[in-house]
């Protein structure tokens, strides 16, 4: 069964330019190389919710767990964590439409 890796975070103040360069230049291509398929990205413009939410599609739960333990993922996550705060993730069964 397909699953989604749902991630949320807030962009760290004063790091916006570095953040966007990293996401476009490294993060998106990196998750694709690891076998994930980015399917959605949302930005919160009002309210007390995470600023960014990203949904990444994966084939199955064991595959996600394996990638999340890989050196490639850990290195990318470390770079992301230097640019964001309040990072959180969960793996949920994939379905169409908005998931939170």
Residue spans for each PLM region:
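An amphipathic, aromatic/His-enriched active-site/gating alpha helix that lines ligand/cofactor pockets
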Residues: 24-39, 57-92
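Charged, often glycine-rich, active-site loop that binds/positions anionic groups
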Residues: 53-55
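Residue-level signal for secondary-structure boundary sites
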Residues: 15, 62-64, 97
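Active-site-flanking beta-strand signature of metal-NTP-handling nucleotidyl enzymes
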Residues: 3-10
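Short, surface-exposed ligand-recognition loops at beta-strand->loop->(often short) alpha-helix junctions
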Residues: 10-22
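Short, low-order "capping/linker" segments at domain edges
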Residues: 92-100
């Amino acid at each position: 069964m397909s699953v989604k890796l749902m991630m949320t975070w807030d962009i760290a103040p004063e790091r916006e330019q570095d953040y966007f360069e990293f996401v476009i230049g490294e993060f998106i291509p990196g998750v694709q190389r690891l076998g994930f398929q980015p399917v959605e990205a949302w930005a919160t413009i009002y309210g007390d919710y995470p600023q960014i939410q990203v949904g990444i599609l994966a084939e199955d739960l064991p595959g996600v767990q394996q990638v999340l333990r890989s050196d490639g993922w850990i290195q990318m996550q470390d770079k992301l964590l230097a640019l964001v705060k309040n990072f959180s993730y969960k793996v949920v069964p994939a379905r169409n439409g908005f998931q939170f």
